[in-house]
Amino acid sequence: AGHFGVTCPSFAKSIGIVLFVASVGLIAGPKFFHNFKHNFKSYVILGFCIIIAGGLCTAAICLIGNVNGALAAGLLSGALTSTPGFAAAQEAAGSAKDIVSVGYGIAYPFGVIGVVLFVQLMPKILKVDMAKERAKLAEDAGNAPKSFKTKGLIAVDSLGMMPLCLTIVLGLIIGLIKIPLPGGAFFSLGTSGGPLIAGLLIGHIVHIGPIDLKPKKSVMECMREFGLILFLIGAGCEGGAGFVDTLIEQGPILFVYGMIMTLVPMIVGYLFAKKVLKLPILNNMGALCGGMTSTPALGSLIQVAGTDDVASAYASTYPIALVTVVLVEQMIVLLF
């Protein structure tokens, strides 16, 4: 639709991603911290490994394909669908920031589609027993959600929209916090990471004093799906606009480079998590979505797995990948 001139307001994509990650956080919150403590080292190592693999792949393409550093950084940020990485690359590129935008636009569509297809197809190819894997994931996350006494608590509304609104406000505030990094860049969780962290925290504590903050799960699932639809519509229109023209003008080889930058870190991350870290398949896939900073893939994985528990692995790996990709983007621009 984007290729044929259909436009979507930019705020629709932003609203969609905020609704999606806030709802996911609230649903996954009760089990998140146990899973995080149990697999903390694995998630940190995996998030770092995925982005470094992408960086090394990009460096190789720069050397072998004689690709400009700013263009390569744009391709990598698109391949990893990383807006913070894209912003860091533009800042480092200075006057060449338009070249970064070209690379981002070429690699972004496959960056979204590639990870989504991977998490959908791999369980089917491996003939994974989802019921068995869900049981493993539930056991890893603490067997059962925390049990809370709700008697005597004040429910502000029956649907739990107040906790969702509180999560969104708190999440946006968290997302605005900027932490300085070497090279003059800044790290922030943004509209995707901030509401997710806020949702996990509020989903974990469940109440503040006498006020009940436990949302109705069915409502959160509805908001999660609605948010994902909005986000994908916005991302699709944005990615499709000018994609074909840019591809024809710049040459299909850049699209191939973008595909490689998506596939290599994704496959390396999957194999590393499976062979070295020995993570179960759903932990592996959830952490892979976080390491690839792919929110659409998380939505797809939740559908495939039939459980929101995979969001714990995503949320644990995502911040590590976010910081690393910002640093790697700067290095690529400066070195090549």
Description of each model-found segment:
Residues 12-20, 38-50, 72-77, 190, ...:
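Cytoplasmic-side transmembrane-helix entry/capping segments in multi-pass membrane proteins
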Residues 7-22, 70-77, 186-200, 226, ...:
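Structural signature of hydrophobic alpha-helical transmembrane segments
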Residues 1-10, 19, 150, 161-219:
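Structural signature of multi-pass alpha-helical membrane transport proteins
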Residues 3, 9-39, 197-210, 220-247:
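Hydrophobic transmembrane alpha-helices of secondary-active transporters
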Residues 3, 7, 31-32, 64-66, ...:
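Transmembrane helix-loop junctions at the membrane interface of multipass transporters and ion channels
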Residues 123-164, 210-211:
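Intrinsically disordered, low-complexity non-transmembrane regions of multi-pass membrane transporters
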Residues 61, 65-109, 277-320:
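Alpha-helical membrane segments and immediately flanking helix-loop junctions
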Residues 30-58, 108, 241-267, 318-319:
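Entry/N-cap segments of selected transmembrane alpha helices
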